[in-house]
Swiss-Prot record:
Membrane topology: Single-pass membrane protein
Keywords, comma-separated and alphabetical: Membrane, Photosynthesis, Photosystem II, Reaction center, Thylakoid, Transmembrane, Transmembrane helix
Protein name as it appears in the record: Photosystem II reaction center protein M
Phylogenetic lineage: Bacteria, Bacillati, Cyanobacteriota, Cyanophyceae, Synechococcales
Pfam family, one: PsbM
Amino acid sequence: METNYLGLLATILVILVPSIFLVILYVQTSSKSES
């Protein structure tokens, strides 16, 4: 069970971290284009 929990946590991190990074880049580019 611990390995499954760690695997699930790792999968969530692998999915969330790039998503947050892309959102930050999108917000920066959109704010730059507006101004």
